[in-house]
Amino acid sequence: MINIRKSHPLMKIVNNAFIDLPTPPNISSWWNFGSLLGICLVLQILTGLFLAMHYTSDTMTAFSSVTHICRDVNYGWIIRYMHANGASMFFICLYMHVGRGLYYGSYTFLETWNIGVILLFTVMATAFMGYVLPWGQMSFWGATVITNLLSAIPYIGTNLVEWIWGGFSVDKATLTRFFAFHFILPFIIAALALVHLLFLHETGSNNPTGISSDTDKIPFHPYYTIKDILGALLLILALMLLVLFAPDLLGDPDNYTPANPLNTPPHIKPEWYFLFAYAILRSIPNKLGGVLALILTILMPILMPLLHASKQRSMMFRPLSQCLFWILVADLLTLTWIGGQPVEHPYIIIGQLASIMYFLLILVLMPMAGSIENNLLKW
């Protein structure tokens, strides 16, 4: 009797990816975030689909259509807040997932890592366009400020911005195209995630030691399926606590005011998950310089494989690198805090120092620490 799980063309793919997949026996809870990201993506696509059924992408009716969803549609309020806070959970999982990759040296799987970086950019673009759709004050001014950064590009900048806007300012054309892109991109993300998984399964998972685990593997099911289910339950618990008790905790009160091109909010800022990059952008007094710093900030993960100087893959046995890694985490949290503060005395200098520290840590100190640790191994 041939097992259908191993013979059926479709079941075989599922089996090789989620059931009989040989997995390292020692991967910790830091390896849960991949499956959690998959759950977040499915949740966002489903809630987004139901929101799109009632949303209208027109400047005159967008704001009131979101209000209509919250007030008149059956369970519309919970769908809307699950979608908004689901994005926050998505980014928490994303940053944890990337942080895990940096700590344990997973970036040495080049194809998997590069597809992952592309995924990160695509999710960021999708989230930015989604934030514009409710057409509140912060939606409008956020879209204006961020798209306007492209005007810093020499020669073609202004034309490029007007092309993206579909006019001479953020208006109906901009909102319509952002809605179209926001709808299609999650499906592209889902396809990219499958490619990400495909490349990962070519090499197998990394593990906390950074040493090959080919001599000692266990099947994914039941060991890691049950572990992933626990992770999923905790994720859904956290999300629902946020949705049901503090749905507006991570949002901006300005977005409950309809978009008004004639009235600029006192502090324009993006959602919390972009604040670290926004802080670096603001800390440079020159427009083009700020834009370049912003691009460099989010390009850093791509450089990681090139900057790896250590003979060991993981940071598990590298105390100096561990120390620098946690300083980097603290630095990113500092930047996130600064990005949400007004541009005035103590915050400006803190932001500039934290920005310098970010680039210094990644480009200079961490590779140096790797080399020092290599020399210490010789003793």
Curated annotation (Swiss-Prot):
Function according to Swiss-Prot or TrEMBL: Component of the ubiquinol-cytochrome c reductase complex (complex III or cytochrome b-c1 complex) that is part of the mitochondrial respiratory chain. The b-c1 complex mediates electron transfer from ubiquinol to cytochrome c. Contributes to the generation of a proton gradient across the mitochondrial membrane that is then used for ATP synthesis.
Cellular compartments annotated: Mitochondrion inner membrane
Co-factor binding details: Binds 2 heme b groups non-covalently.
Gene Ontology biological-process annotations: mitochondrial electron transport, ubiquinol to cytochrome c
Taxonomic superkingdom: Eukaryota
A GO molecular-function descriptor: ubiquinol-cytochrome-c reductase activity
The protein's name: Cytochrome b
Lineage: Eukaryota, Metazoa, Chordata, Craniata, Vertebrata
PANTHER family for the chain: CYTOCHROME B
Annotated positions binding heme b b566: 97, 196
Note: Heme 1 (or BL or b562) is low-potential and absorbs at about 562 nm, and heme 2 (or BH or b566) is high-potential and absorbs at about 566 nm.
